């Protein structure tokens, strides 16, 4: 397991510029989508898979350059500037970065987003 003790300190630093609104995104599957998808799956005897990603944002690369100043927790490096390379919690663009990363992963294993709700992923059966 990786050491994420310093993650919160970087988020709390807040040394960054404003994030454009076009780079923010919060991915939420609609309640109606879940109900309809589960009903269709049940009626057609289809397999349903779901999952949760621990530390999900830190798995996604950060697509922009965000600088922070390191705190006392970093010892001799305190006060030095650093570039954040992962989509940490607290960054406005983290939701969009994670959604793009998840979309790339889902497409790479054969899933496609539903046209009605792009947070529902479907794999065509042949």
Predicted stretch roles:
Residues 1-126:
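Long, low-complexity, charge-biased intrinsically disordered regions
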């Amino acid at each position: 397991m990786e050491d994420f003790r310093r993650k919160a300190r970087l988020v709390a630093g807040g040394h960054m510029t404003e994030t454009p609104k076009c780079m923010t995104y919060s991915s939420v599957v609609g309640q109606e989508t879940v109900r309809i998808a589960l009903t269709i799956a049940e009626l057609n005897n289809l397999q349903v898979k779901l999952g949760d990603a621990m530390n999900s944002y830190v798995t996604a690369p950060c697509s922009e350059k965000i600088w922070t100043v390191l705190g006392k927790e970093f010892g001799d490096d305190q006060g030095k500037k650093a570039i954040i390379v992962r989509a940490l919690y607290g960054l406005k663009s983290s939701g969009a970065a994670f959604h793009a990363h998840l979309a790339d992963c889902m497409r790479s294993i054969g899933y496609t987003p539903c046209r009605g709700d792009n947070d529902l992923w479907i794999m065509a059966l042949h």
